[in-house]
């Protein structure tokens, strides 16, 4: 009687060992792919802001997008931001009819040494005239080539090759008394935001 129970017990233990040996071993060398973990949430957001050009006078504007105050405020609730598209538009005002203006502009990396006097001699630079008797019915748009510069304008580290806008404007006839600009620059695009944070940061 005792021998029979011992045999049953031994067989039961052998069955357990056999079943365990048939299971896929769990190890770092398993051929099975690891399951994908949860992805960080992202949010695609449009943005737009405007700044006027100097009124009645020759002038230049340098706009490094990553450190521009309006952009920094827009991104303050997220730790990471990546541009998906970026454009600049020269938008004339009613004043431009009597005060024409020529505008040169270009998108370059922030570390670029290109100056306002070199815009038209640099790849991508454009010149746009607004105002006078003939005015474009639609704003002229200059797009940034994000393949030639770093689209990550906010990250755990800072980069020196994020987009920078250079603008040089020249009135047809300078006017010291003019207080309203003949045109404004409108910067707009879309940015992919991730890693939201509770406390705003620049």
UniProtKB/Swiss-Prot annotation:
Disulfide bonds: none
Subcellular location per the Swiss-Prot or TrEMBL entry: Virion
This protein's UniProt keywords: Capsid protein, T=3 icosahedral capsid protein, Virion
GO-annotated molecular function: structural molecule activity
Family annotation (InterPro entries): Tymo_coat, Viral_coat
Function comment: Self-assembles to form a T=3 icosahedral capsid composed of 180 copies of the capsid protein. The capsid encapsulates the single-stranded RNA genome.
Protein family: Belongs to the tymoviruses capsid protein family.
Protein name from the UniProt record: Capsid protein
